[in-house]
């Protein structure tokens, strides 16, 4: 069993300026939150965020093609919120031929119906999360679990009784924190909606210190290089461990470096091994296990 990693205060102090330098650099490349920034009304942003975050797996260039087509339909339907609401009476046939990997058109239609039912019943994500998350909660995991439970229950059509009986493609859109999965896309949604600093939106009445880092292969690789974890599994426990160590760097906003760290990997600017032409200009080189002296 891997011993839990807890960085020292001195290590936190050493990491902080280099993470700040990385975070201050202009963002590299597109990001799924760009779809949410197309809209100004809160209901539109909430619906757009649910859709964009849920399909943000794999390469950005791959899933963005499907998202582009979905948001063309949404805009033609009066914007994401109005378009989703129309699914309460009729699915958009334009979704039928769309797909991304194992998520098929009927899964997307069910997802939009589910979102519409949620918005109608709960009045929006912000209203729901205000009830689901207490200031006393150590992190947002219980609130996210309640959100997933609510969405899963609303995904069932008449005659359906078990979420696990639904198609694999749809089930992939709604992972559960209690399953042990890192729930990267769910944590990314929470980051978008909670933090108020760019590029995030600050719509949820949740404290940033309760967020858990959206753990994917890029974040995991860089976190190991920085000594934020020794764990090799991309699990919820690993995400929590990395977040706890980031809290030693910034107790109030531990995942403020997530956007920059993720794009370090997404852009190809970190290969996980020393390549002088890549490592030398990197802001993290002095504190990286392979790029510098660690």
Language model region names:
Residues 1-294:
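HhH-family (HhH-GPD) DNA N-glycosylase catalytic core used in base-excision repair
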